[in-house]
Design a protein with these regions (language model features):
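Actuator/coupling domain of P-type ATPases
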Residues: 57-75, 79-80, 120-123, 127-227, ...
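Membrane-embedded alpha-helical bundles of multi-pass transporters
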Residues: 112-115, 147, 166, 400, ...
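Bilayer-spanning, highly hydrophobic alpha-helical transmembrane segments
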Residues: 96-105, 334-362, 374-382, 387-392, ...
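Conserved cytosolic catalytic loops of P-type ATPases
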Residues: 31-53, 57, 189, 218-312, ...
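Signature of the cytosolic headpiece of P-type E1-E2 ATPases
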Residues: 466, 475-588, 603
Length: 736
């Protein structure tokens, strides 16, 4: 695994889904490539390969040989992508303008002035520049693919326009061929030119619409400053962001975006972290506090010591995750890819069959009809609509989720979320604030002076979230110092134990209390009932088999938890709560939230087993926790969801990360997944229906019934509209 790398490269010169398939097939054939996929909507190649066998330069060389190009240089890669997209759009715009300037008079001659002298020759002269100068890219693209034994949309456009033009050219210079047979020598120069004009117009609209699908990622990238001021040998200098190094001292002034992740080395201020945490209130930052790249300094100037720079910052990782998710393929896309891979050859076969049937059934009188119908079949067929149906919906859906602080790892996660019927919620840090405080102390007997010192020392070594509450409370008391423990051991799911001056001390749940055979007095038991019935957790502190104290710990329920549970139920999702707290505490919390099913006293293994049991019942389970603990349950769940709270830890362990502590993001995430998958199905349905209905009509299936024969010009307009309509439908999700 150490020699394997995964990279994403922008792809240039792709025109359709067939192009994406060609690039993908080319790269997959290279030695050392493990997996490769091309996203037509984002024009991105994602490839996993062995570094010892292959280099980005060699990948690019193979793609160039196939008629396309890659941007492999890491420096300013996104800027280059944007620049190339802008150039492509500008070129397309001028081609569209130029083509229509010639097409309009061509249509006038073909429809109104067809009987004036030299009308055919004038139409030919007007059509040639449209074919050569404005539509030349279709012909060169088709020729490159033909040399490789492949085909794409360029092939369809080049063949259809060439057939119409060459047929017209023959009729212009050899009209006697038809006159001798009692037939009229029709010309279709306008068809060849209008096809190119419409296809170019469609591609222009498609490019513009596709650009709008990446709005969310551009907003995220806009949070990255281009330059930073650093202190080098006591002198302040401005450098490009790419040249920052770990350990650099970075100067940030009021109103500026922070360029790195790091700690405040000097100064203090308030920082707007809403882009990551979702919290609108600026956070006070003092010396030693952590700050994140992309957040905004509100007030004073300060100096940061860089800890993570470039691609290692939380913001950069969020951007990379969103880009990778947008470029991933939904399960249904694998089927679509297979269809688009054979789409053009099948259409070519249908076009040939169409011409043969017309001539066979109708004889020489129907040669013109046969040619027109074959041209219409070639023109109306659209692999682009199929190729764009899934990725554009994914781009908009995942981008919208990111803008709402929901990070979805890939298309598979999005698809799985739609199927979830049970959500399992860990209590601490998910339903509650995750900032517990010690609210009550019950001492079983008179305290010895060192008891609190031992308790403080033991809890300072513990990683359990409740330990912090005890540490904070003890540190507020005077004269308490952590004892020098002889040993320390963490007991998974139960607590901790430590030795001090020949005695074994323990701190943890009532399960640890039982393990040490300690008992609770009647008086303490009565107080315990009151504490736990109010939703407080209980921590037991003892020495050997003697209970020394019970500490009541309160972790407030989040303000949005009850509403989130209600909304999930409205969506038809069952809710379960898991907690390591006792039965009374769990009952009190679940009752307040309206959760009927819960499991108390749950160890990590118990939580994993609970998820497994639900799955054995045929349920699709989503596990929601803080992204740090309960890794077993997360790994088992059909969908793993972590409450990230603005950290990068959760991004590594979950399929979905909620970047803020607001639990209302959870029902939003499920709703968005359903909307996105529904949109994908809509797009695919209309793309398939369009081709299933359009191709037979273009072939002339309605002609025997009502004499209707589809004009190639209308066929080209329909083809252009089909792909644009798919993209526009995807964009509608962003407005919901």
């Amino acid at each position: 695994m150490g020699n394997t790398t995964k990279k994403a490269f922008p792809v240039l010169n792709m025109h359709c889904a067939g192009c994406a398939n060609n690039v993908e097939r080319t790269v997959k054939k290279l030695p050392g490539v493990i997996e490769a996929s091309v996203n037509f909507a984002t024009n991105t190649l994602t490839v996993s390969y062995e570094k010892e066998q292959l280099t980005p330069g060699e990948i690019r060389a193979a793609v160039l040989a196939a008629g396309y190009d890659l941007i492999v240089e890491e420096a300013h890669k996104e800027e280059r992508r944007e620049e190339e997209q802008h150039k492509r759009y500008t070129r397309l715009k001028w081609k569209v303008i130029g083509a229509w300037i010639l097409v309009v008079p061509l249509l006038v001659y073909s429809m109104i002035l067809m009987h004036v002298p030299y009308s055919n020759e004038i139409q030919m002269v007007l059509a040639i520049p449209v074919m050569v100068f404005f539509g030349g890219g279709f012909f060169t693209g088709a020729w490159k693919q033909a040399k490789l034994g492949r085909s794409n949309m360029d092939t369809l456009v080049a063949l259809s326009t060439s057939i119409a033009f060459l047929f017209s050219l023959f009729n212009t210079f050899f009209p006697e061929f038809w006159y001798d047979r009692g037939l009229e020598p029709h010309v279709y120069y306008e068809a060849s030119a209008v096809i190119i004009a419409f296809v170019l117009t469609g591609k222009l609209m498609e490019e513009r619409a596709k650009g709008n699908t990446s709005t969310a990622i551009r907003k995220l990238m806009g949070m990255q400053p281009k330059a930073a001021r650093v202190l080098r040998n006591g002198v302040e200098e401005e450098i490009l962001i790419e040249k920052l190094q770990v350990g650099d001292l970075v100067v940030v002034r009021p109103g500026e975006q922070i360029p790195v992740d790091g700690q405040l080395s000097e100064g203090d201020s308030y920082v707007d972290e809403s882009m990551i945490s979702g919290e609108p209130v600026p956070v006070e930052k003092k010396k030693g506090d952590k700050v994140l790249a992309g957040t905004i300094n509100q007030r004073g100037s300060f100096i940061i010591r860089a800890a993570q720079v470039g691609s290692e910052t939380v913001l950069a990782r969020i951007i990379a995750m969103v880009q990778e998710a947008q470029g991933s393929k939904a399960p249904v896309q694998r089927i679509v890819d297979r269809i688009t891979g054979i789409f053009v050859p099948v259409v070519l076969g249908i076009a040939i069959l169409t011409f043969v049937l017309w001539v066979t059934i109708g004889g020489s009188e129907y040669i013109s009809y046969g040619i027109l119908s074959a041209v219409s079949v070639l023109v109306i067929a659209c692999p682009c609509a199929l190729g764009l149906a899934t990725p554009t919906a994914l781009m908009v859906g995942i981008g919208k989720a990111a803008s709402q602080h929901i990070l979805i790892k890939d298309a598979v996660a999005l698809e799985q979320m739609r199927k979830v019927d049970v959500v399992v919620l860990d209590k601490t840090g998910t339903l509650t604030e995750g900032h517990p405080t010690a609210t009550g102390w019950l001492w079983a007997q008179s305290q010895e002076p060192h008891f609190k010192d031992v308790l403080l020392a033991a809890e300072m070594k513990s990683e359990h979230p409740l330990a912090g509450a005890i540490v904070s409370a003890l540190q507020d008391e005077e004269k308490i110092k952590p004892a020098a423990l002889d040993s320390f051991e963490s007991i998974t799911g139960k607590g901790i134990k430590a030795s001090y001056e020949g005695h074994t001390y323990w701190v943890g749940s009532h399960k640890l209390l039982k393990d040490f055979s300690a008992t609770v007095s009647d008086v303490m038991a009565e107080m315990l009932v009151l504490y736990e019935s109010d939703g407080n957790g209980s921590i037991y502190f003892g020495r050997e088999n003697v209970l020394l104290a019970i500490i009541a710990v309160s972790d407030p329920i989040k303000a949005t938890s009850a509403e989130a549970v209600k909304e999930l139920k409205r969506q038809g999702i069952d809710i379960c709560m898991l907690t390591g707290d006792g039965q009374r505490t769990a009952l009190a919390v679940s009752s307040r939230l309206g959760i009927e099913r819960f499991v108390a006293d749950a160890l990590p293994d118990d939580k994993a087993e609970f998820v497994r049991e639900l799955q054995m019942q045929g349920k699709k389970v989503a596990m929601v926790c803080d992204g740090i603990n309960d890794s077993q349950a997360l790994a088992l769940a059909d969908v793993s969801i972590a409450m990230g709270k603005g950290t990068d830890i959760a991004m590594d362990v979950a399929m979905v990360t909620l970047m803020t502590s607001d639990l209302l993001l959870l029902p939003k995430a499920f709703q968005l997944s359903k909307q996105t998958v529904k949109l994908i199905h809509q797009n695919l349905f209309w793309a398939f229906i369009y081709n299933l209905i359009g191709i037979p009509i273009a072939a002339g299936i309605l002609f025997p019934l009502n004499g209707l024969l589809l004009n190639p010009m209308l066929a080209s307009a329909a083809m252009a509209f089909s792909s644009v309509s798919v993209v526009l439908n995807s964009l509608s999700l962003g407005r919901k």
